[in-house]
Amino acid sequence: MMKASRSDTFMLRTWIQLLVLFVIMFIMSAILPIAASVEGLGFPCYFPNLVDYSLLNLTLRNAAKHLTPTLFLEAPELFVYITWSVLVDLASAIYYVVGALAILQARKTHLTSMITLQTWINLVGSHTMLFIGIARMWTLQLFIHVLSYKHVMLAAFIYFLHFCLSYMHTLSLVSRNSPKWSVLLMEQHIPKQSLLSTILDYGKPLCVNMYLSLLALEMLVFSLGFMMAIGNSFYILVSDTVLASINLYFVLTTFWYMMTEMFLQDYLKLQFGFYLGVFSGSLILLLPVLRYEAVFVSANLHKTVAVNIAMIPAMCVIAMMFRLFRYSQQVRKPENSYTPLPKRFKKRRQKQDQQLIMVETSDEEL
């Protein structure tokens, strides 16, 4: 067994320090929504209550003198979203802590090369993934702070940053920021029948699916918040912002379905958390239609909005059935221990071989 180099030891120490910051940031993210809901703790308003949605009028245009009510999450729905976000981050913190313990345990008995430690850290969660996770929790805290002051434009901008960070974080969790053939090579360094192999085989897929479900809800919050900012910035009909937010959510989820089948399914076959999150988001979208049915009926938009919302779960069912079909085909098919190189790598390798043959031929002639 070879001892870890100083660079590997430094890398592990900095990774554990980032993990400590991740846990501290999670604790703050869990405490902040509770503190923001209690009067007298410095928050001017109860952050889920942006406007009085009983004044919602779909036939009016924005007056630009006050906050015009548009479609957004009300207090119960926003509470559910924040609670689920905290629970997912809790599961992630537990996963990282157990992963760190597994790496320390495997380091004592299974370290076989100087690059093995770096490989284990990349498989559990690299420094970049931890940093992005810290940043996304911080932006969510900032989003809650700004909502308590009723600054919709600033809140929409901050949530845009949070959504981008969450998107990159989830994408990195699935793909590990590496090509498939590189991931297969890294997985060969995992000690068999160890805590590290258990946490990577069972803990990480569960954590990834929870983040996928959260990403689906974050797409909804981003769509509603973005169009709420647009609706309060320009002189447009409130009904246009409502339909635009629904259609934006439909486009974002459809894009993720396509990316899953074309790219992400190579890394994780069993990823159904996103579909469950989309179903939950569709139910959340239906609540305002049911709660303010008279408003939508009076504006002759009840059927239009209902049809647009119904397209989201319908597309989700189609995408989920297609994923189930491909998953069943992949389970029946024997899994290869290797992944073919892309064509560009093959062509590069062929050119190198041809150059090598030409050099050997010229040497023989000499």
UniProtKB/Swiss-Prot annotation:
Q: What's a GO cellular component annotated to this UniProt protein?
A: viral envelope
Q: Membrane topology per the record?
A: Multi-pass membrane protein
Q: What is its main location?
A: virion
Keyword terms, alphabetized: Disulfide bond, Glycoprotein, Host endosome, Host Golgi apparatus, Host membrane, Host nucleus, Membrane, Transmembrane, Transmembrane helix, Viral envelope protein, Virion
Keyword Transmembrane found: yes
Pfam family name, one: Herpes_glycop
User: What InterPro entries has UniProt attached to this entry?
Assistant: Herpes_glycop_M
Q: Where are the transmembrane segments?
A: 18-38, 84-104, 114-134, 154-174, 210-230, 236-256, 270-290, 305-325
The protein's location, in the record's own words, is: Virion membrane; Host Golgi apparatus, Host trans-Golgi network; Host endosome membrane; Host nucleus inner membrane
Topological region Virion surface = 39-83, 135-153, 231-235, 291-304
Q: Which residues are exposed on the Intravirion face of the membrane?
A: 1-17, 105-113, 175-209, 257-269, 326-366
The record describes its quaternary structure and partners as: Interacts (via N-terminus) with gN (via N-terminus). The gM-gN heterodimer forms the gCII complex.
Q: Which family does it belong to?
A: Belongs to the herpesviridae glycoprotein M family.
Function, please? Envelope glycoprotein important for virion assembly and egress. Plays a role in the correct incorporation of gH-gL into virion membrane. Directs the glycoprotein N (gN) to the host trans-Golgi network.
Q: What is this protein called?
A: Envelope glycoprotein M
